[in-house]
């Protein structure tokens, strides 16, 4: 009975993920209940009506989720798969449910316990893929435009089987982009900004929106983890921080170091495209700072991190995003605002804002 959806999330953030899916489902007048097991790395949402699970994964835009890394419709838990034939029961769950899917992903939750199953998942994938193709459940070749079959193992011999839609899911295995830490980067935080680019900016827009020669500002830049990503894309960067910047970045000639407080700094040039900010400060204070930059027209796009409190983390994020949205609208500014708890985030979320410049008289056009 496929009336459930499974959502992957960061271990320890199951309650936030559950609150989010419950709220978004209710907005569509779809009702059910979330099953939460702490530190499991996933949430199940069981709908009261049978067809509603499929409707949820079609109608809730995946990019609007903050805490969910992936979402899929699943059936009942398959338990005690026979060691001599694990494939047949899985295939049986999908017969009549989906046809000619474009991809198979045999996955686990992102926890230390579950990762021990990854080797088994890789081993199972090849025979399972062949069997699914034989039954026409999977297309003969991978197809990025067709649904994805998910087999989600929660324990040895126990899995959920289901599907997601490729136009409304995470394109990444386990919902996690695989990024390699560059050995010459000043800090591991560099991966947060790189992942944010992958998550928030479509690949076919990188050349236009992450273009060589753009001007950028990094508030709270030291030692330069986020500045590094901008340097790699041949931008010119104002790095704002009272601390020391990595000499390797200064040697590129692309970075100007402003020894100043990121909350007090005001730009001196008018053609800044990107603002990035990863400062350890209260979420409200950071949100107000970025909003000020957007209202003043000091930047076109911004990526920033919000450090989360110990309690009411989902509410905190929602309140800050709503506050920003309201203040921008009060100033007649259109903007796209999205937030995500990235794989490389910890007790924090990353927010992306893109200002959509109006063609009103006296306002700068969006082309610099």
Swiss-Prot record:
Active site: 307 (proton acceptor)
Chain positions recorded as S-adenosyl-L-methionine binding sites: 189, 222-225, 241, 261, 278
Protein name: Ribosomal RNA large subunit methyltransferase M
Membrane-traversing stretches: none
Species of the source: Yersinia pestis bv. Antiqua (strain Angola)
PANTHER family, per database record: RIBOSOMAL RNA LARGE SUBUNIT METHYLTRANSFERASE M, RIBOSOMAL RNA METHYLTRANSFERASE FTSJ DOMAIN-CONTAINING PROTEIN
Enzyme class: transferase
Function: Catalyzes the 2'-O-methylation at nucleotide C2498 in 23S rRNA.
Subunit structure: Monomer.
One of the GO BP terms on file: rRNA processing
Localization of this protein: Cytoplasm
Domain of life assignment: Bacteria
Gene Ontology CC annotation, any one: cytoplasm
Catalytic activity line of the entry: cytidine(2498) in 23S rRNA + S-adenosyl-L-methionine = 2'-O-methylcytidine(2498) in 23S rRNA + S-adenosyl-L-homocysteine + H(+)
EC number(s) per entry: 2.1.1.186
Lineage: Bacteria, Pseudomonadati, Pseudomonadota, Gammaproteobacteria, Enterobacterales
NCBIfam families xrefs: PRK11760.1
Encoding gene per record: rlmM
Protein family membership: Belongs to the class I-like SAM-binding methyltransferase superfamily. RNA methyltransferase RlmE family. RlmM subfamily.
Pfam families in alphabetical order: FtsJ, RlmM_FDX, RLMM_N
UniProt keyword list: Cytoplasm, Methyltransferase, rRNA processing, S-adenosyl-L-methionine, Transferase
UniProt GO MF annotations: S-adenosylmethionine-dependent methyltransferase activity
């Amino acid at each position: 009975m496929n009336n459930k959806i499974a959502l992957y999330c960061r271990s320890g953030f199951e309650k936030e993920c559950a609150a989010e899916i419950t709220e978004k489902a209710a907005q569509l007048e779809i009702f059910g209940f979330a099953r939460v097991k702490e530190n499991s790395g996933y949430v199940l949402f069981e709908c009261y009506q049978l067809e509603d699970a499929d409707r949820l994964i079609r109608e809730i835009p995946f990019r609007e989720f903050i805490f969910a890394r992936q979402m899929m419709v699943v059936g009942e838990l398959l338990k005690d798969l026979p060691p001599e034939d694990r494939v047949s029961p899985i295939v049986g769950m999908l017969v009549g449910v989906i046809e000619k899917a474009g991809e198979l992903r045999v996955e686990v939750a992102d926890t230390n316990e579950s990762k021990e199953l990854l080797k088994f998942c890789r081993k199972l994938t090849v025979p399972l893929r062949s069997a699914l193709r034989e039954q026409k459940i999977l297309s003969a070749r991978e197809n990025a435009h067709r649904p994805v079959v998910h087999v989600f193992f929660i324990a040895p011999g126990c899995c959920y089987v289901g599907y997601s839609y490729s136009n409304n899911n995470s394109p990444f295995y386990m919902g996690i982009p695989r990024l390699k830490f560059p050995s010459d980067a000043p800090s591991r935080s560099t991966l947060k900004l790189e992942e944010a680019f992958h998550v928030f900016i479509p690949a076919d827009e990188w050349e236009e929106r992450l273009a060589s020669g753009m001007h950028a500002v990094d508030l709270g830049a030291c030692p330069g983890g986020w500045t590094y990503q901008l340097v790699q894309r041949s931008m010119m960067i104002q790095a704002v921080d009272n601390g020391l910047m990595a000499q390797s970045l200064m040697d590129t000639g692309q970075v100007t170091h402003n020894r100043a407080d990121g909350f007090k700094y005001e730009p001196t040039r008018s053609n800044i495209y990107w603002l990035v900010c990863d400062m350890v400060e209260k979420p409200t204070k950071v949100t107000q700072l970025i909003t000020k930059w957007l209202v003043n027209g000091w930047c076109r796009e911004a990526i920033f991190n919000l450090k989360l409190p110990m309690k009411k983390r989902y509410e905190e994020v929602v309140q800050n995003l709503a506050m920003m949205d309201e203040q921008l609208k009060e100033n007649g500014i259109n903007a796209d605002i999205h937030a995500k708890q990235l794989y490389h985030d910890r007790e924090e979320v990353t927010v992306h804002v893109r200002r959509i410049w109006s063609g009103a008289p006296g306002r700068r056009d969006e082309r610099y």
